[in-house]
């Protein structure tokens, strides 16, 4: 996909070095200001479609780091009307910081299942992603790995690769294990997974698939869309080889379902253009935007009935865990403590 360069027209940014803040020009009623953690090339087609349908212009600032800090520092003077980010942990952190406001919308409640949105209407999931296994086609038989619990089975000793346990996606997964098995059970499980690691946790999700391709390990734990990105990466064709070496394996299909996380959005407490911000969230939860999400990023639409991309469909149907993301978010601190307690990131044998 071509990279895009966002021109912030009708938007003035003055950097105050001493204060570390930014002052934006007041937006008109037909505009809104968006802080986005999500990459520009992904969200631009969605925002263009929104503007075309509503006439509302979206002024976007890509803020992969420090989004919460910027909003908190500006307080009521924050120019942000809405935020777009990934992972339940980041959404919940915004909620806990008190920088969001509740939204009551029949459209959002209809489009987004209850377990993928905040019970108070403070944040809304817009896409879902599965934390699944990519297993070696050559060295792992179909049906050999069927659950997260299996990852702690001694038969997989020296065969698992994963990134840091402190990564947001892994913390959410561990939190879900606490929800299902209690903290003591989750700790025992995490110790078992650690014992089965082929190497010290490192790299990103794609690096784990590469390790399977290279024979370092047999099982990689990743988010589903990384498989899609590798399969279609014409700029880095070596990643297609990594993807070709592995088989998508959804976990816990015979019971609760595969662990799920979200990307999502919220309206800020300081929003000067709340009505426009709510319209954006409603649009992003609708059929047209959900289809763009599915086709462009190989994520799962949060709205029931919107089809997955053909590539994702080729991996087969699956059942996702319906555990409340609010519950997962509340258990994240305990999950992070477990990572430290068992010394997960120190690797096997430590």
What kind of region is each of these model predictions?
Residues 78-83, 101-135, 149, 159-162:
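A structural signal for short loop-to-beta-strand junctions that line the ligand-binding cleft
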Residues 176, 181-251:
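Ligand-binding pocket segment of bilobal, Venus flytrap-like solute-binding proteins
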Residues 27-92:
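Early extracytoplasmic/lumenal segment of secretory-pathway proteins
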Residues 101, 138-146, 178-187, 271-277:
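Short helix-loop capping/hinge motifs at secondary-structure junctions, enriched
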Residues 35-38, 119, 135-137, 143, ...:
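Short beta-strand->loop
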Residues 132-139, 260-273, 292:
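A bilobed periplasmic-binding-protein/Venus flytrap-type ligand-binding module shared by bacterial periplasmic
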Residues 158-165, 283-307:
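Periplasmic-binding protein-like
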Residues 321-350:
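Conserved C-terminal helix/tail region of periplasmic/extracytoplasmic solute-binding proteins
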């Amino acid at each position: 996909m071509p990279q895009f360069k966002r021109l912030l027209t009708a938007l003035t940014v003055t950097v105050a070095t001493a204060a570390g803040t930014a002052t934006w020009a007041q937006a008109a009623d037909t505009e809104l200001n968006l802080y986005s953690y999500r990459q520009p090339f992904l969200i631009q087609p969605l925002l263009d479609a929104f503007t075309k349908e509503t006439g509302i212009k979206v002024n976007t600032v890509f803020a992969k780091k420090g989004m919460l800090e910027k909003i908190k520092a500006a307080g009521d003077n924050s120019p942000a009307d809405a935020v777009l980010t990934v992972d339940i942990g980041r959404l919940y952190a915004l909620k806990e910081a008190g920088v969001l406001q509740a939204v009551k919308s029949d459209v959002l409640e209809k489009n987004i299942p209850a377990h993928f949105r905040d019970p108070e209407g403070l944040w809304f999931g817009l896409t879902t992603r599965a934390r699944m296994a990519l297993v070696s086609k050559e060295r792992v038989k179909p049906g050999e790995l069927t659950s997260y619990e299996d990852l702690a089975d001694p038969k997989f000793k020296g065969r698992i690769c994963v990134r840091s346990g402190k990564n947001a996606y892994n913390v959410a997964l561990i939190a879900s294990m606490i929800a299902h098995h209690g903290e003591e059970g989750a700790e025992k499980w995490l110790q078992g997974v650690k014992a089965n690691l082929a190497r010290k946790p490192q790299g990103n999700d794609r690096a784990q698939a590469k390790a399977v391709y290279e024979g370092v390990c047999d099982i990689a734990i990743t988010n589903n869309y990384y498989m899609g990105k590798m399969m279609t990466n014409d700029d880095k064709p070596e990643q297609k080889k990594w993807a070709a070496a592995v088989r998508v394996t959804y976990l816990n299909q015979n019971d609760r379902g595969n662990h799920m996380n979200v990307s999502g959005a919220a309206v800020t407490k300081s929003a000067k253009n709340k009505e426009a911000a709510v319209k954006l969230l409603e649009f992003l939860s609708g059929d047209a935007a959900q289809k763009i999400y599915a086709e462009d990023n190989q994520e799962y639409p949060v709205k029931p009935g919107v089809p997955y991309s053909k590539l994702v469909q080729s991996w087969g149907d699956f059942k996702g865990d319906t555990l409340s993301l609010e519950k997962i978010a509340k258990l994240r601190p305990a999950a992070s403590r477990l990572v430290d307690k068992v010394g997960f990131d120190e690797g096997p044998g430590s």
